[in-house]
C-alpha cells in the first residue's frame, strides 16, 4: 500500500466496490465492482479504504480479469496474509471524481433522500435505496409514518418519461406517475 501522506476522509465518499477474498499466494485479491461497467472501477484513482477507523490510500500495481472475476494486485501487498487483511474493505473515492452526467441520467447517490411525490401531489415517501433489476432500476421508497394506504415501503420503477415525470435534485423532489396504493 502507498506510504504517502496520511489521507483525510473524502468530503463526499462514495463506495465503488469491495475487496473480496484472496487469490493465490502472491497477494492478489478479488474485487467486486459496483460500477455499471465492472472494469470502470479502475478509472477512479486513488482508491481509499478505511481500516481501524483510519483512511488509507490503495495504489494498484496491476489488475486483470480472471474467469468471471476481477482480481487486483495492491502495491506493497506481496503475500496471502497481507492481502487477507484487506478482505471486505470497501473501495471508496470522493464523489467529485465522478464524471458529470447528461440528460436524464442520475447517480443513485443523488437520488437518495429525495421525496417522491405523485403527479396528483400525494407524498409517497423518501428514496432509501435503489435496486438494479436487469430491465430497469427501481427506487425503494420508505413511506411516511401516516401513510393513508398503510404502506411501509414502495418499489417504484425508475423509468424516466413513463413513471418518472420530473427530477429536481435542487429541491430534492422526484415526481412520479404512480398509484399510491400500489
Swiss-Prot record:
GO terms for molecular function: ribosome binding. One of its GO terms (biological process) is ribosomal small subunit biogenesis. One of its GO terms (cellular component) is cytoplasm. Residues 103-182 form the PRC barrel domain. Keywords: Chaperone, Cytoplasm, Ribosome biogenesis, rRNA processing. InterPro entries: PRC_barrel-like_sf (IPR011033), PRC_RimM (IPR056792), RimM (IPR011961), RimM_N (IPR002676), RimM_N_sf (IPR036976), Transl_B-barrel_sf (IPR009000). Signal peptide: none annotated. It is found in: Cytoplasm. Binds ribosomal protein uS19. An accessory protein needed during the final step in the assembly of 30S ribosomal subunit, possibly for assembly of the head region. Essential for efficient processing of 16S rRNA. May be needed both before and after RbfA during the maturation of 16S rRNA. It has affinity for free ribosomal 30S subunits but not for 70S ribosomes. The PRC barrel domain binds ribosomal protein uS19. PANTHER family: RIBOSOME MATURATION FACTOR RIMM. Belongs to the RimM family. This is Ribosome maturation factor RimM. It comes from Serratia proteamaculans (strain 568).
